[in-house]
Amino acid sequence: MSDGNTAAAWVPTGSVTVRVPGKVNLYLAVGDRREDGYHELTTIFQAVSLLDEVTVRNADVLSLDIVGEGADKLPTDERNLAWQAAELMAEHVGRAPDVSIMIDKSIPVAGGMAGGSADAAAVLVAMNSLWELNVPRRDLRMLAAQLGSDVPFALHGGTALGTGRGEELATVLSRNTFHWVLAFADGELLTRKVFAELDRLRRAGDPPRLPGPGPVLAALAAGDADQLAPLLGNEMQAAAVSLNPGLRRTLRAGVQAGALAGIVSGSGPTCAFLCPSAAAAVDVGTEVSGVGVCRTVRVASGPVAGARVVPAPTEV
């Protein structure tokens, strides 16, 4: 713990803003339930251009404010992962978490895009910069994994192969830009309930398992959306659709509108549609919006970088 005489020397004034992306799962294979209740996952994440902005300032006490879409649905206390990230980072360096956090949400809430995990990753990066801590990237990843299995990818960004609970990451070569339409269905799907439903379905008759991720990795390396489209797969999709049958209509609407393929992303209820071009994605998004099968539609592209500090505007 630092003493009051030295603290001022290593606490610069001002603020730091970090942009951080949401994610889609292009491939998700789920192992059987382990004794500890978790499932081994093999997944391919891609960070996409729906970004939250997280600003951290020095303050007298820890506080959290949230604006933007769905902000009223989120806690602004210790229940929020961003708050927990501030406490964890401060504990790691032996300080009090005396910062104010402002989150401007563009990643839809409860959309399965790991927006809460993204905000937690952004807080780690912002505090590291604001306090000039120089905590190495390796240690940031360790802290991120303590917060949750999706937090390390929000730091990593790009495209990655995740194993374990999804937190053990290997960078994946992804040439070219892929264009997505993201349709956020009505209703929430709690991840634990989707896993439980998948366990039930497997006991009853075992929905088909995906082949290994090799062909998906090859399509990403080739940068070929037509090659990637038929390979998109999610073993949780059957469980998500079982709990929310309306997802079938959403998936059908996207493909009928011209998407190359559609998939439930992660545990849902987001449906991700791969499109052949940016213009096609706009057309598909417009058509899906008009059909009334979901609450929100967004157009995005990927891969994009993980949590990064926004450069301060230069003085003229």
UniProtKB/Swiss-Prot annotation:
The active site is at 23, 150. This is 4-diphosphocytidyl-2-C-methyl-D-erythritol kinase. Its EC number is 2.7.1.148. Pathway: Isoprenoid biosynthesis; isopentenyl diphosphate biosynthesis via DXP pathway; isopentenyl diphosphate from 1-deoxy-D-xylulose 5-phosphate: step 3/6. Keywords: ATP-binding, Isoprene biosynthesis, Kinase, Nucleotide-binding, Transferase. The keyword Nucleus does not apply. One of its GO terms (molecular function) is ATP binding. The keyword Transferase applies. Belongs to the GHMP kinase family. IspE subfamily.
